[in-house]
From Swiss-Prot:
Species whose genome carries this gene: Campylobacter curvus (strain 525.92)
Role according to the record: Involved in the synthesis of autoinducer 2 (AI-2) which is secreted by bacteria and is used to communicate both the cell density and the metabolic potential of the environment. The regulation of gene expression in response to changes in cell density is called quorum sensing. Catalyzes the transformation of S-ribosylhomocysteine (RHC) to homocysteine (HC) and 4,5-dihydroxy-2,3-pentadione (DPD).
Signal peptide: none
PANTHER family: S-RIBOSYLHOMOCYSTEINE LYASE
One Pfam assignment: LuxS
Cofactor(s) this protein cannot do without: Fe cation
Enzyme class: lyase
EC number: 4.4.1.21
GO biological process: quorum sensing
Listed name of the protein: S-ribosylhomocysteine lyase
Length: 171
């Protein structure tokens, strides 16, 4: 099994909140795709609550598109990490990490301004696979925590994992 890019960084020294350009690739037609690690919580120390993460997923996807999409840049997908410490965002185009951080900050402010559960997009049994598993209160707490801490830029080289030095193997 190949070692995935996300497992080549040392999670013990990764700061959060932070934006990390996790991967870039070219499509067969030459379009650039960037995958960003949007780390909300310091790995292995804290994680986002399940219901709040789900609500954030519904809100964050739209707000990030509002703030980041432009000519030559379009978000493909934003998905929560299984570890609940962040989201992965795939983008056509090459926004800078600072542009992503600015859009993320603006999105957190937008989320705080959502005042009612009824304002959460696609919150119904037809469009959501777990429509009862939401918490706007928890989403607000997550957004407030990000804004309070500030969003940094994470450099891949500074957190590169030396598998050999840590006694780890590639599987």
């Amino acid at each position: 099994m190949p070692l995935l890019d996300s497992f080549c960084v040392d999670h013990t020294i990764m700061n959060a909140p932070g934006v990390r350009l996790a991967k870039t690739m070219d499509t067969p037609k030459g379009d650039k795709i960037c995958v960003f690690d949007l780390r909300f919580c310091k790995p292995n120390e804290t994680m986002m609550p399940e219901r709040g993460t789900h609500t954030l997923e519904h809100l964050f996807a739209g707000f990030m598109r509002d703030h980041l999409n432009r000519e030559g840049v379009e978000i493909i997908d934003i998905s929560p990490m299984g570890c609940r410490t962040g989201f992965y965002m795939s983008v056509i185009g090459e926004p800078s990490s600072q542009e992503v951080a600015n859009a993320w900050e603006a999105s957190m402010k937008d989320i705080i301004n959502v005042l009612s559960q009824s304002d959460i997009p696609e919150l119904n049994e037809y469009q959501c696979g777990s429509y009862k598993m939401h918490s706007l209160k928890e989403a607000h707490e997550i957004a407030n925590n990000v804004l309070k801490a500030g969003i940094g830029i994470i450099d891949n080289e500074s957190i590169k994992l030396d598998l050999h030095a840590k006694g780890l193997k590639k599987h």
